[in-house]
Every structure is written in structure tokens, then in C-alpha cells.
């Protein structure tokens, strides 16, 4: 099949971006994301092998996917992750492989990942205060994350994007500090609205919600800039003369569904057409039976929803750490 194919959904949107969750396991226990006790260990046959994930990815690239992001859980806890990146990088028609991580293991893997073909990384980081970091992650080391950021910069996994979930009463006093990181560094900081999910429901309240207006009020020197990618969920701003950018991702107050270009593949082989929908398509079963999963995707892609319904209180049942954001 021609790897220059174009994959379109029922609304004429070009779908060219696949996010692969390689594991639902994580080495942190962030309060809004994962239970303190962790999650039950799953049987091996319930999780796709890296070879199976690669096979699905190759099939989707043949249909028109040209960008892949590897996520988790925490993807760097999955054994063989560097090998997966290396194999995917050989895939003709794939232009970019990126990875989202909490950064704890990044100092160990950054150089190998870069050599394997990874282009850049997004790092989840909600505070620059070591004590607050240990609290929100239930025991994590901010120092290790900062080491990972430095190593990623050193080997060229840039521009680095920091994903910061805004939580009222926790890190809203650090907005200016995060923005300051963009001035002299090739780092983009993206502030993300706290979204209501099962694990994070107790954190979800009006008092803890922070909209993008609050960020702009705290840093009035931010100037809006034109986005280079209309499918990006972020609206970007910059302090004049800064090397990096500031992004605002507002799934609650400002939908970005109109230009959605992405699919999500979970570690147990389910294809999600929309992050905020419980609808899933099983690809693991058909793949293991030797069926052509490309035909399944082509049949199902027309059912990708026009938009989410978060504002109506419709929240998905699957935990975010099982999807990869």
C-alpha cells in the first residue's frame, strides 16, 4: 500500500498522528493520575508485545500516519523501549517519533533514544519545588527529573516541552517561574487545565480549576504567536525575545476538536478514536488471528466523534494512565 496515503475521518479531518501507550505502569504515583497503591499487574497475554505494537504502527503508517508519540504510564519502564524506537524509525513514511515521560529515567536513556531515532521529548512536570514534587508524586525526586532534562538538552532531544497540569492551591504560585524557564532555554512550557477523570475526581473542583486567563493575567508580557501546527491543542505565546514558548491547553474552556488529527493505541491493543470517548476498537484480537487490521481501521475511522462532551459532564471510565493522554 502507498505509504503516502491520506487517512480521513467522517468529517474530512486528516488523521496522521498516532499515540502509542506501551504500558499502564509507572514509577510515580501522581495524586491526580494514579492510585497510591499502584495498579494490579496484568497477565502477559493481556498486554501487546512490542513487536505487536510495532506491527500495528506499521499498518497505520501505511494508511497515512506520519507521526508517532510513545507514551505510558511511563514508557521508559517498559523493557525494550529503545529497540521499539529503533525499529519504528526504519518505517518508511514515518516523519517523526517523539516520547512523553515523567523524566525520572531520562538521564539514563536520552542518549540511546536519540541514537535510535527519537526526535524530542515531552516531560510531565507540575512543580519546581522539591518538597511539592515529592508530595504530588508521592515520593518522586525532582533532582532526577532535572538531570533528565539536562541530558535531553545535551543530546539534542529538543525543543523540550514541559507539560504542567495547573492545580489551584498547589502550583498556581509557580506560573511565573515556569514561564521564566522559556526565556534563556529552548524549552516550551505547556500549561494544561486539570481535567476530570476517575482517579483525579477528588482533585477536580472549581477551587482547583485554573483557566488560561489566569496564566495570562499573571504574566501580561506574554504575546500570542501563530501556531505552526493547526492540529496542536495548544495556543502559543512568547515573552518577547525568549528562546522558548508558552502553550495553553484548554480542553474544558476551549475545545480543540475541530482540527483533531490523532488516534490512540493502548497497551492492551485497543484503538481509541477520541481521548474523551469510552468507545474502543480491539486490534489485538484480530492481529493475533492474522486479520488485516488496516481494513478494520478504515471501516471504523468514519466513526471518530466530531468533538468531546466534557462540558456536559461526560467523563471517560478508563483511567488516563491506561491511555497515555
Curated annotation (Swiss-Prot):
Residues where GTP binds: 19, 69, 100, 161, 262-264
Biological role stated in the UniProt entry: Catalyzes the cyclization of GTP to (8S)-3',8-cyclo-7,8-dihydroguanosine 5'-triphosphate.
Reported cofactor(s): [4Fe-4S] cluster
Annotated catalysed reactions: GTP + AH2 + S-adenosyl-L-methionine = (8S)-3',8-cyclo-7,8-dihydroguanosine 5'-triphosphate + 5'-deoxyadenosine + L-methionine + A + H(+)
Binding site for S-adenosyl-L-methionine: 32, 73, 124, 195
Protein name as catalogued: GTP 3',8-cyclase
Manner of cofactor binding, per the entry note: Binds 2 [4Fe-4S] clusters. Binds 1 [4Fe-4S] cluster coordinated with 3 cysteines and an exchangeable S-adenosyl-L-methionine and 1 [4Fe-4S] cluster coordinated with 3 cysteines and the GTP-derived substrate.
Organism name: Peptoclostridium acidaminophilum
